[in-house]
Curated annotation (Swiss-Prot):
SUPFAM superfamilies: Caspase-like (SSF52129)
Lipid anchor positions (S-palmitoyl cysteine): 247, 260
One Gene Ontology biological process: protein autoprocessing
Region (130's region): 108-125
One Pfam family here: Peptidase_C14
Residue positions of the active site: 104, 146
Species per Swiss-Prot/TrEMBL record: Rattus norvegicus
Function, as annotated: Cysteine protease that plays essential roles in programmed cell death, axonal degeneration, development and innate immunity. Acts as a non-canonical executioner caspase during apoptosis: localizes in the nucleus and cleaves the nuclear structural protein NUMA1 and lamin A/LMNA thereby inducing nuclear shrinkage and fragmentation. Lamin-A/LMNA cleavage is required for chromatin condensation and nuclear disassembly during apoptotic execution.
PTM: Phosphorylated by NUAK1; phosphorylation inhibits self-activation. Phosphorylation at Ser-240 by AMP-activated protein kinase (PRKAA1 or PRKAA2) inhibits autocleavage, preventing caspase activation, thereby preventing hepatocyte apoptosis.
Reported regulation of activity: During activation, the N-terminal disordered prodomain is removed by cleavage. Concomitantly, double cleavage gives rise to a large 18-kDa and a small 11-kDa subunit. The two large and two small subunits then assemble to form the active CASP6 complex. Can be cleaved and activated by different caspases, depending on the context. Cleaved and activated by caspase-8 (CASP8) and subsequently by caspase-3 (CASP3). Can also undergo autoactivation by mediating autocleavage at Asp-162 and Asp-176, while it is not able to cleave its N-terminal disordered prodomain.
Region: Tri-arginine exosite, residue numbers: 25-27
Protein name: Caspase-6
Catalytic activity: Strict requirement for Asp at position P1 and has a preferred cleavage sequence of Val-Glu-His-Asp-|-
Quaternary state and interactors: Heterotetramer that consists of two anti-parallel arranged heterodimers, each one formed by a 18 kDa (p18) and a 11 kDa (p11) subunits. Interacts with BIRC6/bruce. Interacts with RIPK3.
Length: 277
């Protein structure tokens, strides 16, 4: 008797070049939740430089046709209300949806001004049973937050230690506190993280985070021409080539960072230019 491993053979021939439809009336809504300061009882440090992280992607996503809405230091109840409002709105005439969180993180939570919120509570509002007008459309979540307590060590330690001064205008590297876990979200979701799980996410106090800086640069160069997950791979490469030069923690000097993304997309994602009105 011959035994074989069972497998499923679909009769459907899949087109590897198939793309999401990007010919709707509008590109879609992009929400940016920016958190610089936190309620004192959380004992979380101020996130200097995060306003640059708000402004840079605002400009880039606007150029790609998104309607960008920015919110600063919202309380958890306010943030949930904004997310709920958008998830219950109609996206019938939109290509996709995008949401950016700039904050501290912990476990499977992200911090608002006064409390932490479970990320799956936020993404769950955009699943098919809750937001039918986004079924089959890309839902992109970008999370700039620390995800652990380790620095990525360079393989070739040829770094020169630079001494940091205490002037406010100096571009000092800091880290976002606590950790965020990689979370499943569902079909047509794309979860983008500033750093791989278990490692620090670096943020400069003047220029903003490494990840958002380099994501914004790649969007400016290739946002309308390159498939989006390929663009994210370029961002991974660019961030991985950075190192910490100025930091109050001498042990952080020379350390590295590598972002990551978890794609549940089912087609290629191109932000093709919209026709001029």
């Amino acid at each position: 008797m011959t035994e074989t491993d069972g497998f499923y053979r679909s009769r459907e021939v899949l087109d590897p070049a198939e793309q999401y439809k990007m010919d709707h009336k509008r590109r879609g809504t992009a929400l940016i939740f920016n958190h610089e300061r936190f309620f004192w009882h959380l004992a979380l440090p101020e996130r200097r430089g995060t306003n640059a992280d708000r402004d840079n992607p605002t400009r880039r996503f606007s150029e790609l046709g998104f309607e960008v809405k920015c919110f600063n230091d919202l309380r958890a109840e306010e943030l949930l209300l904004k997310i709920h409002e958008v998830s219950t709105s109609s996206h019938v005439d939109a290509d996709c949806f995008l949401c950016v969180f700039l904050s501290h993180g912990e476990g499977n939570h992200i911090y608002a001004y006064d409390a932490k919120i479970e990320i799956q509570t936020l993404t769950g509002l955009f699943k098919g049973d809750k937001c039918q007008s986004l079924v089959g459309k890309p839902k992109i979540f970008i999370i700039q937050a620390c995800r652990g307590s380790q620095h990525d060590v360079p393989l070739v330690p040829l770094d020169v230690v630079d001494h940091q001064t205490d002037k406010l205008d100096d571009n000092v590297t800091q880290v976002d506190a606590a950790s965020v876990y990689t979370l499943p979200a569902g079909a047509d979701f794309l979860m983008c993280y500033s750093v791989a799980e278990g490692y620090y996410s670096h943020r400069e106090t003047v220029n903003g985070s490494w990840y958002i800086q380099d994501l914004s640069e790649m969007l400016a160069r290739h946002g309308s021409s390159l498939e989006f997950t390929e663009l994210l791979t370029l961002v991974n490469r660019k961030v991985s080539q950075r190192r910490v030069d100025f930091c109050k923690d001498p042990g952080a000097i020379g350390k590295k960072q590598v972002p990551c993304f978890a794609s549940m997309l089912t087609k290629k994602l191109h932000f093709c230019p919209k026709p001029s009105k």
